């Protein structure tokens, strides 16, 4: 099984080589042609990627671990890397994760219900996941869960505000500009873009794509993905005192 797995994936058709820096392209090409001459061409392993089955009506899951804090995650099926909804979701991620976010201000600062709060998006060739998460005192898990649901519902109904979108756009573009100053980071990003089918020039379109997202886009995407019927909730709590003493 390991040999078959290696044969299927470790082939030229599934590989991308990214070289950034002060190099001579002709010499680099010759070097890699020599080094990988014996690698089989193979075939693309992910031409037809199955989409995950949408979930609905799942009961919240709870786990008890040897931790002092409680952690809550509320997840939704997300977008794929090739989906036009991915960028509005990226902006929603940024707007929901910094110290100026509605979640931070309402849940942590105003209500004192969380230690940290944010959002994260995971994308692949198949639709991934979008998560809202927080850490809190185990005694506050019920009120903070209620408030988190309420804030997500408001986001699903109204999308981002003008201030949130402007801030998120500036953060996203600024962060990428800083990361791309590193040859290794820029090269890795371009390699992944090519592997995912976005093309080596995807970064050239990136700024315009982000700047073109409107408030209506965020409202449409939030309503599409953050449906309470398809929400998956997971909570991690400290050990149950009753069961631990028995």
Where are these regions (language model features)?
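His/Glu-based metal-binding/catalytic segments typifying zinc-dependent metallopeptidases
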Residues: 44-102
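Charge-rich, well-structured scaffold segments of protease-associated domains
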Residues: 1-44, 80, 110-246
